[in-house]
Amino acid sequence: MKQLLSYTLSMIFVFLIFSCNTSEKKKAPQQDEGTQVQSVQNYSIDTSGVSIKWTAYKFTEKLGVSGIFDQFALNLKNDHGSLETLLEDAEMTINTVSVNTGNEIRDPKLRTSFFKIFHTDTIFGKILDTKEGQETLELKMNNILHNVAYTYSLKNDTLFLTTHLDLRQWNGVEALKSLNKECYEVHTGGDGISKLWPDVDVVLKFPIKMNL
């Protein structure tokens, strides 16, 4: 009888321990799930505040000359979500006639001596990949499609997307020569060399709002 009582108490004790362990294991996933949900951030873009800034370079020492485009259209496939989600498959068309450097003498020359020779009335861009380390966009100029890398970062309430272009990849040499000939003197540096580089840096700014 004593052995039976001892055996019964032992089984009850083991059952209680097993039940406690099972309860703890069930609670753990709930805590992890709650933490994961809280880490997901939800953003949206104020499309009315988007801007495009480009910087080209003259002189041997590469002095930057910057400008913007006043007319462009942005097509977002996703109007809210993470930064990666907002950028996914986003498209942009840019009217090159709207090029604006704030210089009334320079701007007409850019239209006639560069973009006209470049056969590019409209620049078309599309985000192809937003994965970290694989950020790629497609850019069409001079009837040529070419993929380029980009980076993006969030600073305060603005999403910055930056990319570097080599216009030679879109057969832009003749257009560069045409513009440099038109602006020969203003492209001549202290070394007496007139130089217009094929490099262009582009920065897109997207005002971001965090949704609750």
Model-flagged regions — what are they?
Residues L16-S19:
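C-terminal motif of bacterial Sec signal peptides marking the signal peptidase cleavage site
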Residues M1-L9:
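Bacterial N-terminal signal peptides that target proteins for export
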Residues N21-L212:
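Low-complexity, acidic/polar, glycine-enriched regions of mature
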